Design a protein with these regions (language model features):
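Accessory N-terminal region flanking or inserted into the helicase ATPase core
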Residues: 1-26, 33, 141-303, 384-388, ...
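Motif I (Walker A/P-loop) of helicase-class P-loop NTPases
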Residues: 31-39, 315
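Alpha-helical scaffold elements adjacent to nucleotide-binding pockets in ATP/GTP-utilizing enzyme cores
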Residues: 37, 62-67, 86-90, 114-118, ...
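Conserved P-loop NTPase-based nucleic-acid remodeling module centered on helicase motor cores
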Residues: 47-206
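Catalytic acidic motif of RecA-like/P-loop NTPases
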Residues: 58, 307-311, 335-336
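SF2 helicase catalytic motif II
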Residues: 300-311, 329
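Conserved RecA-like helicase ATPase core segment
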Residues: 315-405
Length: 405
């Protein structure tokens, strides 16, 4: 099998316009090859027209520094970044071009505060006995009427308005305490919000993030609910998830009026929509495509390392980029995925990149394709290294080391 060269890959894309899926076994040098494709792209298309996306910011910074050192300079601040950052760049450029407020990410603390506000509303409903539709879903989901106790931290005291809280307030009447609501000047609303379990809020935030990463938008809700109508338990779970998401979005809009705030997990969904809307009418006339790409800050070449860890929303974003005219080189191995718990489906994504909208051409990466001499360790090498480092065998062996053969 002939070695795969970066220039050959780019020549093929320039010739037929199809994306390339580069698959390599573990240790075959996939990241090094992806980096070499980026370097070739920067030299061929220009310093701002090639970008590499990796799975994390730390890896992006390390690889980006290598690119800058090798080139001696960089027109881009971050030639290696994340797929979410590419989406954020497109969203920012789109909104700037139309005079809309620039996007700002919500951090974890801000998301938690909004979710606590959402749940505090239903805690107040439960205390007042004025349950809403979401309260009813919470009751069914937790399978008990007193579901409030399940989402509150132990030791936070009684909720304002509850019978025990009212009795405590009556017992304090006539005392010197100046606070009619709670100690330390906290209002009852504060106590509702702060008393909610951190673990519950964390799980709720993760659930909403998974919905975004799976690409489950508002328009998909009816179809998904119809698909689970025969499973009562699953139907309640989905209905509750969608109801809480709607309330979370409403709380976000109320908390940040006039701003465009979004979760990091929603970046790829919003990015795909922005690119789709910008190029939706370009099927017949491609003359304005380069200008639209430049207006959105899209590079001519995007190299994606560890593509097997991309979420479904990420794959849709890549498909929209491919439709917009971005040259794509996807590098990965489905057997090395480490993000399946966050909405990655490696085998499906690799197959979809070839059989789906991208119609990517698959090519195999042979170890050493980057030009570096890559040695293949034998079992003797492994044993020798373990002995030299005094690493004990993982197998139980009653004989002392001196008597072992």
């Amino acid at each position: 099998m002939t070695r795969l060269e970066p220039g050959t890959v780019l020549d093929g894309i320039d010739r037929d316009g199809a994306a390339r899926l580069i698959v390599g076994t573990s240790g075959s040098g996939k990241t090094e090859f992806a980096l070499s494709v980026l370097m070739a792209g920067l030299r061929r298309y220009g310093g701002t027209q090639a970008v590499m996306a990796v799975s994390g910011r730390v890896a992006a910074d390390a690889l980006g520094n290598r690119v800058i050192r090798e080139l001696g300079f960089s027109v881009q601040a971050r030639p290696v970044t994340t797929l979410g950052a590419v989406a954020f760049r497109a969203i920012s450029a789109s909104r700037e071009g139309t005079g809309l407020p620039s996007p700002r990410l919500l951090n974890g603390a801000e998301q938690d505060a909004l979710l606590r506000q959402v749940m505090a509303v239903h805690l107040r409903h439960a205390v007042a006995g004025d349950d809403c539709g979401t309260c009813d879903l919470l009751c069914v989901y937790f399978a008990q009427d007193d579901w409030v106790k399940l989402i509150r931290d132990a030791g936070t005291g009684e909720m304002p308005g509850s019978a025990a809280s009212a009795q405590s307030s009556l017992s304090q009447q006539g005392s010197d305490s100046p606070s009619p609501t709670s100690a330390g000047g906290s209002t009852s609303a504060d106590r509702f919000t702060r008393g909610i379990s951190d673990a519950f809020i964390s799980q709720l935030r993760d659930m909403l993030a998974r919905l975004d990463e799976l690409g489950v938008g508002v328009h998909e809700e009816p179809r998904l609910l119809d698909a689970v109508t025969e499973d009562a338990r699953l139907s309640v779970q989905w209905r509750l998830a969608f109801a809480l998401r709607r309330e979370y979005i409403a709380a976000q809009s109320a908390a940040y009026p006039g701003q465009y705030r979004l979760d990091a997990s929603y970046l790829l969904v919003a990015g795909a929509r922005v690119v789709h809307e910008a190029f939706a009418a370009d099927h017949a006339d491609d003359s304005g495509r380069p200008m639209r790409m430049e207006a959105l800050g899209l590079p001519r070449l995007l190299v994606v390392d560890d593509v097997q860890d991309t979420t479904l929303a990420g794959m849709r974003f890549l498909e929209e980029l491919g439709n917009a005219g971005v040259k794509l080189v996807l590098v990965g191995n489905p057997d090395e995925s480490v993000q399946t718990f966050r909405g990655s489906y490696p085998e499906y994504l690799m197959r979809r990149s070839v059989e789906g909208r991208l119609k990517a051409k698959e090519e195999q990466l042979v170890g050493g394709s980057t030009g570096a001499d890559q040695s293949h360790m034998t079992m003797a090498d492994v044993i020798a290294s373990r002995i030299s480092l005094s690493i004990p065998s993982p197998e139980d062996e009653p004989l002392p080391p001196a008597e072992r053969l």
